[in-house]
């Protein structure tokens, strides 16, 4: 079994422990004051380093999914920044000490913590049409497989002048397919890789996205109605359940139902307002600043 327990370490731990001496040498060479990691593997490595007295500076982990992923319980860092206070019992049950848990939230870039008006985002920045309902479809950094089918279904159902912006990420193939498919449809805007995701979020009325931790958090902080599409089993499933249970998003595993949910949100002011209110209660836009403050305190030994 690969899962660890309080009595034994997993093969994952021992594999990452092999990097301990190299990481210790790198840290010493560059004279770092503190280490922050959003990933399990370096946390495993630094746990080994602490055990062997090879790590002499503080180390902090930042969780980027709305669940306690496997193997966190066999790590031993100074603090664990987690997405939400409701996750504390799950982490504690898995064996992470409660006094090390800080529910600051998932940090996002400052652009996502500021909202531009739709007029500024659409007209002055992105040159998109004003006064029309607009969907934003996020494919993820590599695009998701059923994007072309989903886009065709959504475009077919948009009969009231709605526009669709599709961000394809790094998937050049799906971008070419969609540009060809919607070449004559002026209400569908195909975007490849872009550094302006925050602006597109400001411009849209409803966002479709897979339930990844970072994209979901960015949408939550932006206070945008969210329709979650089919998750990759594992962390994304946990993220979807966390958001759904708190009315931060709606979701369905069926493509046609996903389209229907987005249409309902864009057409029903009351539904959007209810989700917006829930998001305002749960979002944590100050996460990044709180983490920076924590690191400064640890470095200054306060």
Model-found features: residue ranges?
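C-terminal alpha-helical cap of glycosyltransferases
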Residues: 284-302
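Acidic donor-binding loop of glycosyltransferase active sites
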Residues: 202-212
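Donor-nucleotide binding loops and adjacent catalytic segments primarily
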Residues: 118-120, 128-204
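A short, well-ordered alpha-helix in the C-terminal region of glycosyltransferases
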Residues: 271-285
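C-terminal "capping" alpha-helix adjacent to the active site of nucleotide-linked donor transferases
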Residues: 244-250, 254-271
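A short alpha->beta transition loop at the rim of the catalytic pocket in nucleotide-sugar-dependent
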Residues: 204-205, 223-225
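A nucleotide-sugar donor-handling region in carbohydrate enzymes
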Residues: 78-141
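Conserved N-terminal ligand/cofactor-binding loop architecture of enzyme catalytic domains
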Residues: 1-30
């Amino acid at each position: 079994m690969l899962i660890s327990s309080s009595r034994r370490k997993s093969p994952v731990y021992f594999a990452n422990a092999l990097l301990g001496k190299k990481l210790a040498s790198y840290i010493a060479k560059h004279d770092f004051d503190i280490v922050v990691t959003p990933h399990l593997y370096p946390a495993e490595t630094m746990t080994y380093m602490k055990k062997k007295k090879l790590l002499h500076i503080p180390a902090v982990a930042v969780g980027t999914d709305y669940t306690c992923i496997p193997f966190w319980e066999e790590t031993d860092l100074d603090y664990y920044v987690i997405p939400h206070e409701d996750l504390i019992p799950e982490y504690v049950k898995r064996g992470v000490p409660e006094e090390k848990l800080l529910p600051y939230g998932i940090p996002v870039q400052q652009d996502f913590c500021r909202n531009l008006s739709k007029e500024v985002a659409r007209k002055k920045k992105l040159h998109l049409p004003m006064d029309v309902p607009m969907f934003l479809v996020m494919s993820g950094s590599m695009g998701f497989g059923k994007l072309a089918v989903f886009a065709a279904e959504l475009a077919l159902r948009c009969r009231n002048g709605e526009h669709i912006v599709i961000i394809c990420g790094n998937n050049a193939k799906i971008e070419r397919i969609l540009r060809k498919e919607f070449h004559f449809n002026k209400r569908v805007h195909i975007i490849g890789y872009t550094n302006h995701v925050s602006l597109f979020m400001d411009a849209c009325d409803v966002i479709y996205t897979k339930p990844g931790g970072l994209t979901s958090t960015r949408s939550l902080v932006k206070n945008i109605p969210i329709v979650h599409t089919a998750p990759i089993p594992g962390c994304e499933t946990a993220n979807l359940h966390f958001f759904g249970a708190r009315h931060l998003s709606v979701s369905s595993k069926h493509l046609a139902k996903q389209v229907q949910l987005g249409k309902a949100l864009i057409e029903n002011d009351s539904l959007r307002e209810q989700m917006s209110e829930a998001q305002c209660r749960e979002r944590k836009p100050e996460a990044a600043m709180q983490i920076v403050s924590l690191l400064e305190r640890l470095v200054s030994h306060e």
